[in-house]
């Protein structure tokens, strides 16, 4: 296949040319190729496929919201060719059997490349040795059940790749999740990463003060909604603007943009988490957190 008249986006510049494809591989970029199967791109941009490292596909018991097939179609439509699925499904991916079942299901349904994370609990630290997830995911907010500090520390000490939802639940005020809950958790994780000289990834950072505790062992991501939206939207859109962690102040979004530009934050990820309308309307405290944005993140 030959893609003609492309504007090809590279790491440092944009060039015009044609792209020759053989099977699933690009075998040439230039202007002197020929092929019986041609597509005229008409000077539109061609970019590498995005890798979204934070996605919540709803397959298993919540597949009415989305399954691996519909979710991966949304990914491809949005320019995402690889996604990493989070383990807080129903049932959660916290044991070998469920991990293998989800791997099989995604392999059958997904039209995009994918990887799976494995959920850490205080009871499964020995059982997951046989799997090779993209990362071991810790939910400090007790999404997968209450987790103790010993489990968190041992996971960071022993595992090759650890991703963390950093919010300290003891600082929650009812259903509200203040920025201090995230900052306290990030400070704790950064200290453990430095103690064991181990890389740790902080998911969906939302507060400007969290950035103050990053060190050379911390990588992090930010979502489009935390870059572009603020807590003022909660008054008008209520549950439809509810996320975990919550939308913050305008000065937080400004700090996150600065962190992205200076390299403190290395990744933009969608934190795609679709729900049915009934899950988002009504009382803000009772509505479910999450936004469906896998197919629009690049836009």
Tell me what each language-model feature is:
Residues 44-109:
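Metal-associated gating/positioning segment near the N- to mid-region
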Residues 54, 75, 79, 114, ...:
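Conserved, mostly hydrophobic/aromatic
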Residues 125-139, 143-268:
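Histidine/acidic residue-rich metal-binding segments in metalloenzymes
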Residues 32-47:
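Active-site metal-binding motif and surrounding structural segment of the metallo-beta-lactamase
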Residues 65-72, 122-131:
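Short, acidic/polar
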Residues 1-33:
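N-terminal metal-binding scaffold of metallo-dependent hydrolase/deaminase domains
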